[in-house]
Curated annotation (Swiss-Prot):
Enzyme Commission code: 7.1.1.2
Principal place of residence: mitochondrion
Parts of the chain that traverse the membrane: 2-22, 68-88, 100-120, 136-156, 172-192, 223-243, 253-273, 294-314
Gene: MT-ND1
UniProt GO cellular component terms: mitochondrial inner membrane
Protein name per its UniProtKB record: NADH-ubiquinone oxidoreductase chain 1
GO biological process: aerobic respiration
Pfam families, A to Z: NADHdh
Entry keywords, A to Z: Electron transport, Membrane, Mitochondrion, Mitochondrion inner membrane, NAD, Respiratory chain, Translocase, Transmembrane, Transmembrane helix, Transport, Ubiquinone
MF (Gene Ontology): NADH dehydrogenase (ubiquinone) activity
Reactions performed catalytically: a ubiquinone + NADH + 5 H(+)(in) = a ubiquinol + NAD(+) + 4 H(+)(out)
Family the UniProt entry places it in: Belongs to the complex I subunit 1 family.
Membrane-protein topology: Multi-pass membrane protein
Organism, as annotated: Vombatus ursinus (Common wombat)
Amino acid sequence: MFIINLLLYIVPILLAVAFLTLVERKVLGYMQFRKGPNIVGPYGLLQPIADAVKLFTKEPLRPLTSSISMFIIAPILALTIALTIWTPLPMPHTLIDLNLGLLFILALSGLSVYSILWSGWASNSKYALIGALRAVAQTISYEVTLAIILLSIMLINGSFTLKNLIITQENMELIVTTWPLAMMWYVSTLAETNRAPFDLTEGESELVSGFNVEYAAGPFAMFFLAEYANIMVMNAMTTILFLGSSLNHNFTHLNTLSFMTKTLALTLLFLWIRASYPRFRYDQLMHLLWKSFLPITLALCLWFISIPVALSCIPPQL
């Protein structure tokens, strides 16, 4: 039974990721006055299936000088972590209900750095290694602000369980009271998932393709799936943390529909940002975090600690 639950969890995520690639190409196409994919199937709807067949039937190439085991393990690890992060998310019910769900998600998003680092090092290519080092520095840096923002939210929420967050936001979404945190969280998720305008790991002009330059066929598709699964999970997290994923506790179908709609809207905003903004310079990226976001998040964290203490109020307890 657990295997069936697991499959019912994983297959829709992979399908959503596949069609997210189509949505991205269509959105970018229309924003650049092009059509996007429109040959395979009606309106290009079967393009992700054609891409999957092409990628998984090609011969997986491996550089002669690469470290074989690590080269193969890295993409598998990336996809495994990207899919595992979904398990504690209430949509509105979780696959595994964890007491420390938020810490679990934060820890796994930190682990995803290893797959990028291993792939860059095992490829034995200077471009891949530079891309991997950039990715590691960027991801670890932005995790600092993500952790502090989560701590601030937890001080309002009263526990680390994600289900408690839904109860906290029954009357009012947290984005109303914590909008500066929400803005910084959203920008940090862009950097955490290596998306434009923070896609310095795959700067085509200087790094050819970044950490995955030596990958082709199936392993490349795994990295691709992991990246888009991470984008969706980060937007799902944003919905749960700030937008209140539930509408009515008597109709759980409505809750799921509300959650999906908000997550989709945030994902489309990711694509809109990619079409609108040029890439940051690396020093600007680091200055934004260490000189802007970190001081503000620390100050806001102190503010959210002082409010319950000053007003002698406690967060909602289950």
